[in-house]
Amino acid sequence: MRAEIENYVKKIEQSLELLWRSLDVEASTERLNALEELTADPSLWNDQANAQKLLREKSNLEEKLNAFNKLKSNLKDALELEEMAEAENDLETLSQIEQDLKNLSIIAAKFETECLFSGEADGNNCFLEINAGAGGTESHDWASIMMRMYLRFAERLGFKTEIINMINGEEAGIKSCTIRIIGKRAYGWFKTETGVHRLVRISPFNAAGKRMTSFASSWVYPEIDDNIAITIEDKDLRIDTFRASGAGGQHVNTTDSAVRITHIPTGTVTQCQSDRSQHKNKAQAMKMLQAKLYELEMQKRTDSVNEQNAAKTDNSWGHQIRSYVLQPYHMVKDLRTDYETSDTKGVLDGDLEEFVSAHLAMNVGGKK
């Protein structure tokens, strides 16, 4: 067996072993069989809320077990084909098998990470806010680099994106933006990215070529679906309209189509100017508000609201989650997990999967 092929096979087998334990395949299969019996009973629908809950559990188990079995079957097929190709010295087929196994190892690693998702909203779409820290043009440029990094990360995962709101910097970059990320498990993949990001580089805006430090923050919160109830009273809202202009609206409005909603009790603010329709912008801003309030409630339940609020509002040294050093050496380091890589170009081009996996694995392991 070729060394490259053997390497990919070992990676996939390791993933399968971890997935077997993580999924508890035998117990999950028994539970799925029990759910199939329960959901086949017509009387189940006498309690629609419970019926929907059981159907969601059944669908989730089916998806995970089917993916596991397909992964296992694809590896078996590839190994059988590899054995025949080796016997016939079929170099073209061996090359194709190597590529297929490489792709399979990527799928296995992604599936392995997704099996660590355990939150109520992990399967939902999400919103990502980026805000430049103090420092003017330097931080504005860093915020725009972060926006591109996350758009590329979403693209790598097969998610769609919509820029809901964006405010440009005076000279370069952006002051802030809100991105809607659309796809199954989007929140699960992005939720660990909330916090402050620090960049060290030679400034492209300084004629003396000085090394500069910039900060920008990101905050991720899930889009709320019908399965999660968030009650918002009209008396608690202040709704303002204004004219959309520049990036985010992609045009200059002559009417007040942009909408800003303030939740008075919490001071939470959302705004949207991505559509020409004030009605659609209001609906999107309300959806974002529901999502933010849900995230705040989840933070309270886990007794981490103070830490999380500080992480998303205070762009300072004390609340960093990750540092990106481009000078005098190249290194991106997650300060929560200590995971690091010298491939700064890859990271800024959206290669964040290992950072997410490391953080999720740390949480499962109970580390702080």
From Swiss-Prot:
The keyword Cytoplasm applies. One of its GO terms (cellular component) is cytoplasm. SUPFAM superfamilies: Release factor (SSF75620). It is found in: Cytoplasm. It comes from the Bacteria. Keywords: Cytoplasm, Methylation, Protein biosynthesis. One of its GO terms (molecular function) is translation release factor activity, codon specific. Methylated by PrmC. Methylation increases the termination efficiency of RF2. The modification N5-methylglutamine is found at residue 250. PROSITE patterns: RF_PROK_I (PS00745). PANTHER family: CLASS I PEPTIDE CHAIN RELEASE FACTOR, PEPTIDE CHAIN RELEASE FACTOR 2. HAMAP family: Rel_fac_2. Peptide chain release factor 2 directs the termination of translation in response to the peptide chain termination codons UGA and UAA. Belongs to the prokaryotic/mitochondrial release factor family. This is Peptide chain release factor 2.
